[in-house]
Amino acid sequence: YTLPALVLGFTLHEFSHAFAAVRLGDPTPRLEGRVTLNPSAHIDWVGVLLFVLLGWGYARPVHIQPGNLKGRKWGEALVALAGPLSNFLLAAACYALWDALPAGSWSGFFYYGATVNLTLCFLNLLPVPPLDGFSVVRVLIPLRSYRAVAWLQRYGIVILVVLSLVGVLGRVLGAAQAAAMQLFARIF
């Protein structure tokens, strides 16, 4: 169940970035064929394999031109948040379907859909480059402060690998995922 849930989550995540960017005035994702729900436009199979093996991976990132976005700074933050928000909403929908269906049938797929999409949501909200959370932080902090954290762009992947290997990333994502599942249980 993990692989189909992951492909769906990555596809919706990147589509949401592309859709938000185009709606905010940047034609780049449309010109690159990224405003589609076709997984082949968004999936990087090495990134999917890493996610299955390590608990984190990547899809093909959507390229944007921030200068084309309405409300340039805030537009960039909205585009960055569109992906994690779509994963959170998809996780909620999957949880609701899992809760409504009898054990067996498709319930396992929807349970994995909820957990995988929560992982994608919370992983991408971390303020470490190249993740979406860093794009939001970059917009929010003053330029002089940004220079103090710019070095992160060079070492972001290394930081994520180390956090994953020592188990910190798994604990943080697991705690966030558990809290969201409890929230869904109260709602549904």
Locate each region found by the language model.
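Hydrophobic transmembrane alpha-helices and their immediate loop junctions
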Residues: 1-188
